[in-house]
Regions:
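Active-site cavity-forming subdomains of large catalytic enzyme subunits
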Residues: 229, 251-391, 416-430, 461-469
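Acidic/polar, glycine-rich intrinsically disordered N-terminal extensions of enzymes
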Residues: 88-266, 271-278, 301-304, 542-545, ...
Length: 688
């Protein structure tokens, strides 16, 4: 194990000791630091310490001591590691100064067979140009970003080397459009899952929103729909995400702060007042308590008179990435996976148009991973879900078409586009070859994209409009099915109505003014993009081999493998930013003195109002009916799940019992507490 990973493991052991003594106190302290204002709750992503140290700390952002290898950057051993790194850089700079020049043929010949024309160009035109004007790393302010040969080192944001020029020599000898790309709407889906691209239907403009009370969030939803939004995405507050009611001691000071507070069916009814759920697609970013919140949504639709078979939307419900990155887990992994598969089975039977999971790489990337790690870990999470469902006895072609994904769109324009293109091809290969899916809809990867909250800066926040515009354009050129674009003020606080509208308008400019939606996969055939796409695909399968050898993602998580990989990547990125090898405009270069903009403030009165509502609800509901429903839920949760027979779902499936409890107005906290009594709670192990 290298020094960085060893220190990450040491730090995780320190954090892992306290929960055994005081789990409740540990949860409240650590989760406030980890989750407050995270992308899951506000749309900006997890502002990990690796960014806040340099970019400025958000009022709702991640604390600088968040886990998995970040806090140890202050450790003496790590400082020594960093000093060695800087000395090595200085030595390379000295070598470069002594060097008369860089051989222009070296990069041209490295790992490839250039054409005679390219060789001639390198020896003549390029050589003369380098003599007159040496190359300088773009995005490096200090001049330390040099290769071993003394020449400028150009990389993607993830550190992948980038050549000066890409030609046919950078692609496999057998590369052809027919073999490697195919056509839109046809396998392997590199060029998209729809034959008409965005000509038939634009991507869904789904702005992530939720704050304070259900009443206030409902007003924001109506506002967004009025201004051209055609989908909704619900951000829940921290207590809801962790399965606590607003009047729980854990919730004090957190109610409505980084999302909307939803305690009961009554709150969900208010949240969607005036919104036709049969005509509006809704995404809900909720994980451990996903079954309870989804049940509330279904009952609201039922009360509106909607047909469950016609409603469409997405439940995030991706618990694996919580253990890897976001840390909003409640139950142990196996029990959590059981609840996820329950929703697969129930959804396949009763809500065939509703996506019962959105397998998320967004949070993995926000935690500091590279683009490749985001791609590989996210898709392999999908592999794990399919395998668990098949072990339950479910047919992959019944639940497979409703699996969806959620990716991050970061700053490196071409790397992100390549990631999206590779993702579709990889998923097709896995579903067809590994799992034997016959239904072509099971082969399709459909995904939502959100721009990178972790890339936003608190300094000069208007610059964030340009950042998210480029990130959003990359998602569109990569073929996303829906898109959220972060608001420019989200590094500081929850977005205001004005900043949220600006983010929506930016999507609309891309859609209606840029021409990006006029043609399908316009960067196909670019030697650079095709090389990046192949590298992403090959790199992902290399990770899959490692994860297979560990016994799957749950086993890998228990060993800490993905967590350590992300910690290492985040450390490397942060060091490069602090050394100004990577420029962040307005934060570590082009800095000015400025006044802070006006931000949205959530008062403490929200919590008091939610407590009063809960007290009134418990006074008027049938509490005996609630007690009976919760007891049935506990009995079902204790049963061994198995596949249903004769067209029916399993008797052990928890969803029908959760629905019964919801109809009786049991609260989120009461439902989650019933499951805690059966499953217990999870405390992350130390990693070595």
């Amino acid at each position: 194990m290298n020094g960085t990973l060893a220190l990450a493991a040491q730090e995780q052991r320190v954090e892992g000791e306290a929960p055994a003594r005081q789990p409740h106190i540990r949860q409240k302290r650590a989760l406030r630091n980890r989750v407050r204002g995270s992308g899951l709750a506000t749309g900006t992503g997890q502002r990990m310490a690796l960014r806040s140290l340099t970019l400025g700390r958000s009022g709702r952002g991640r604390s600088a001591d968040v886990g998995h290898g970040i806090r140890q950057m202050r450790d003496k051993k790590l400082r020594r590691c960093g000093q060695k790194h800087l000395k090595k850089r200085a030595k390379v700079r000295g070598m470069a100064e002594e060097k008369a020049g860089v051989n222009p043929l070296e990069e041209v010949l490295r790992g490839r067979k250039p054409s005679e024309g390219e060789r001639r160009w390198a020896e003549t035109t390029l050589a003369r140009a380098l003599e007159q004007q040496p190359e300088k790393p773009i995005g490096a302010a200090t001049g330390t970003n040099l290769g071993k040969d003394g020449g400028a080192r150009f990389t993607t944001i993830s550190g992948r080397p980038v050549r000066r020029l890409y030609t046919r020599a950078d692609l496999p000898e057998d590369w052809s459009e027919e073999k490697y790309l195919g056509y839109p709407g046809e396998a392997p889906y590199t060029r998209g899952v729809h034959a008409t691209g965005y000509r038939g239907k634009l991507w869904t403009m789904r702005q992530f929103s939720g704050f304070a009370s259900p009443e206030e969030t409902n007003e924001r939803y109506l506002y967004l729909l009025e201004h051209g939004g055609n989908g909704l995405s619900v951000a829940f507050d921290l207590p809801t995400l962790m399965g606590y009611d607003s009047d729980h001691a854990f919730s004090e000071g957190e109610v409505g702060k980084c999302g909307v507070a939803i305690d009961s069916l009554e709150d969900m009814e208010i949240l969607f007042r005036g919104i036709d759920l049969e005509k509006t697609t809704v995404s809900m970013t909720i994980n451990s308590p996903a079954s309870a919140l989804w049940a509330m949504y279904l009952v609201v639709a039922e009360k509106q008179g909607a047909d469950w078979k016609k409603i469409s939307g997405t439940l995030q419900n991706d618990i694996l990435k919580e253990y890897i990155a976001q840390k909003e887990y409640i139950y142990p992994p196996a029990e959590s996976m059981r609840l996820v598969i329950d929703t697969f089975e129930f959804g396949s039977k009763y809500t065939p148009r509703f996506n019962t999971i959105s397998i998320s790489g967004y949070h993995i990337r926000e935690a500091g991973s590279t683009a490749l790690q985001e791609l590989a870990f996210t898709i392999y999470d999908g592999v794990e879900y399919v395998e668990w469902a098949q072990r339950r006895g479910l047919d992959v072609d019944e639940f497979g078409p409703r699996l969806s994904f959620f990716f991050n769109s970061h700053n490196d324009f071409f790397e992100e586009i390549a990631k999206f293109r590779a993702a579709r091809k990889i998923w097709f290969r896995l579903m067809k070859d590994r799992f034997g899916a016959k239904n072509e809809r099971s082969w399709l990867m459909r995904f939502h994209t959100q721009t990178a909250g972790v890339s936003l800066t608190a300094q000069q926040p208007l610059n964030n409009i340009a950042r998210v515009a480029l990130q959003g354009l990359a998602a569109v050129l990569g073929g996303t099915q829906s898109l959220h674009m972060d608001s420019y003020d989200e590094a500081l606080a929850l977005p205001t109505a004005e900043s949220a509208r600006t983010a929506l308008r930016t999507q609309q400019v891309i859609a209606y003014e840029s021409g990006a939606a006029n043609t399908i996969d316009p960067l196909a055939g670019s030697y650079f993009v095709e090389r990046l796409t192949l590298d992403m695909e090959n790199g992902a399968f290399a990770y899959f081999e490692k994860l297979d050898a560990m016994g799957g993602m749950v086993k890998a998580i228990e060993r800490g493998f993905p967590q350590k990989e992300i910690a290492e990547a985040s450390y490397v990125f942060q060091k490069a930013t602090e050394a100004r090898e990577k420029i962040t405009v307005g934060a570590n270069e082009f800095v000015i003195e400025e006044e802070s903009p006006k931000i949205l403030y959530i008062g403490e009165g929200v919590g008091e109002r939610q407590k009063a509502k809960l007290q009134a609800l418990r006074a008027r509901r049938d509490n005996e009916a609630v007690r009976r429903a919760l007891e049935k839920l506990k009995q079902a949760a204790a049963m061994t799940p198995e596949a249903g027979r004769d067209g029916k779902i399993s008797e052990a499936n928890t969803m029908p019992y959760i629905l019964e409890a919801v109809r009786a107005y049991a609260t989120v906290g009461e439902i989650c507490e019933a499951l805690r009594e059966v499953y217990g709670t999870y405390v992350e192990s130390s990693f070595t």
